[in-house]
Amino acid sequence: MNGKSCFFIGHRETSEAIYRTLYAAVEQHILEYGVTEFIVGHYGVFDRLAASAVKAAKHLYPDVKLILLLPYHPAERPIPTPDGFDNTFYPPGMESVPRKIAIVRANRYVVDHVDYLIAYAWHPASNAWELVEYGRRRKGQNHLQVTILKR
């Protein structure tokens, strides 16, 4: 990951009504924070909306890159780079991680290595919420900045 980077985390069942707020956060991270790489998963509505917001922003900011996070080894579960994405990323060391926790572990790896986190998580009994809390705890250790989108 090069330059300033940002990861998205949110609930799978997110309402599409959050899109405008999400797009505004993407644009803010590009213009105010100098983010050039956005990393997103592909397992739910929030991930789809986050990817759509970055794809829309790329029309105005062509230097911005959109990267798809792969929690499963590409040889085991091949996924071609989707339209609008610039690349895929499979975190190193994930080969021995059990499939059951691969998504959680891949997400945590990315949180440990990005500069910014845009989050939309409100349900305390969820992996998304736990990852946001993890990011908040990491904030002082690795200078991660967390943006929480309001419901």
Regions found by a protein language model. Give the residues of each.
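Acidic/glycine-enriched connector segments
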Residues: 1-151
